[in-house]
Amino acid sequence: MRITRREFAMMTGAAVLAPSLPVRAESANIFVPGFNLPANLDPHQVLDVSETDYALNTYDHLYRWEDNPAKMRPWLAVSYTASSDGLTWDFKLRHGVKFHDGSELTAADVVYSVQRLLGLNKAPSAPFQTVLRPDSVSAPEPDLVRFKLAQPFGPFFSTIPMIAVVNPRIVKAQEKDGDWAATWLASNEAGSGAYRLIASSYVPLERAELERSADHFMGWKDNPRPIAKIDWRPAQVTSTRVLALLNGSLDMTDSNLPVDQVERIQKAPNAHIAKNPTMRLLLIRMNNTKPPFDNINARKCFAHAFNYDGFINEIVKGYATRNAAPLPNNIWGYPKDEKGYDYDLTKAKEYFDKAVAEGAPIKRPIELHVQQPLEQTVQAGQLFQSDLATVGVNLKLVSDTFANLTSVSSKPDTTPDMWIHWVSTYYVDPDNWIGQMYDSRFHGTWKASCWYTNPKVDALLRKARSLVEQEDRAPLYEEVARMIVADSPDIWIYNHIEVVGIANRVQGFRHCPVGSGGEVRWMHLTA
């Protein structure tokens, strides 16, 4: 039975009750965010928005993305030089930077951090694995870091803010059996950032307290009333977060608010909505190694069965723009003439019949994993389920978590049939999206979890990655984007307009596509 749009708009995903939130003392200089904590706290192991938010507050980087549109700002480094062939990069460090234990941060610490990042070989290292070796990073002087790339890498400078610098004296002391202290740093902190973790406060996925580092090297002149403490208490249910914001026990929500919750906040006297364009794609992954998704007609059936405009206009209420290709429509390299797949159930049925005729098991129950705490993924799944039923597809929705999905998607046989997620901005370059998602070299990472393989696509993406000049790279990304769309390995839905609920007492919020405005050092509280 089909549901009406009105009935669908009233649906919300059931969710697990979140831990109760404390009532905040309005006079306390304590900021209480409600966005998620990362699966673990190690910036060299986890790559998602939650980890980026956490690392921006507790760790430092050579350069940092700031503001919207995002711009690179010198941070630990004061300057850099690059050789004409794009292979040698020197970063000059500022003096007097201290880790949270009081020891001085030097170039050798940056070298160790890069070597640890590469050695762990987790998702944050993916952009560097083909161009950096542990011995290709050196410290010729105490304040000079040198990178010698194995080959030219166009996105290299834009990826530099992904390298969080850790304190090797702290980390090495916690190593066990050559594990790079991965277990220890998953629940501790060894940084130099504007805030430091109170380790005793940390409860995985439930709570973390951070206190201001008064002697942070950037100083606090640009914020004379900085927040003294961050009491990070995520609630697993969106409506719980919003209720906490409205009753004064929470200062900020996540940026995945469904429209009904946006409207609640807009009517509140003590909170408001911050609305910012960004570069964040919502897509549905199809496991191209699992029948029926190894059949292009089956994939095109699904691509034509999603109601893109209905979802964007009726469910998201215009807080997004249609994005028909696998990179944001507001970045260079996007093919402006690419229309992608339209919502057409007649076409979907035609492709369904072709897939059946070719022996694809498209009539079997298909599982779509949604992120239960994020209602928008549930809403998208319910809409898709309804329309696919009219075509003849039996879609089952499975509640899951991002942490689990990124883990199981490391192998094709454990990756779900389908799953829905966002791809956020970790570095501002087309490679952050199309390169990491569709070059088969990155199979085993969550970004490449559709397990798509096309040798011609691989070759073009690698060529684009090897060039330095944007004007040479952009046409290649446009070409390869069209090729990928023609193969229909995934379902690209929208580019996000981020909406965040913020208490009126919070001032100084600065949005950036990298981290979604989670950097607290700019903020202050009026009460």
PLM region spans:
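N-terminal lobe/hinge region of extracytoplasmic solute-binding protein
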Residues: P33-S84, Q115, A190-S192
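Gly/Pro-rich hinge or "lid" segments in bacterial periplasmic/extracellular proteins
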Residues: E66-N68, I163-R225, K229-D231, T346, ...
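Surface-exposed binding/hinge segments that line
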Residues: K92, P127-Q174, R196, S201
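Ligand-site clamp/hinge motif
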Residues: T183, H216-E263, N394
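Append "and occasionally in soluble cytosolic enzymes with long acidic Gly/Pro-rich linkers
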Residues: I198, E206-H216, D294-S386, T390-V391, ...
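Ligand/substrate-recognition segments at binding pockets and active sites
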Residues: P204-E206, V237, K354-T425, S449, ...
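Extracytoplasmic/peripheral linker and loop segments enriched in polar/acidic and small residues
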Residues: N394-T406, G435-N504, A527
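Long beta-strand-rich cores associated with HINT superfamily self-processing modules
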Residues: V500-A527
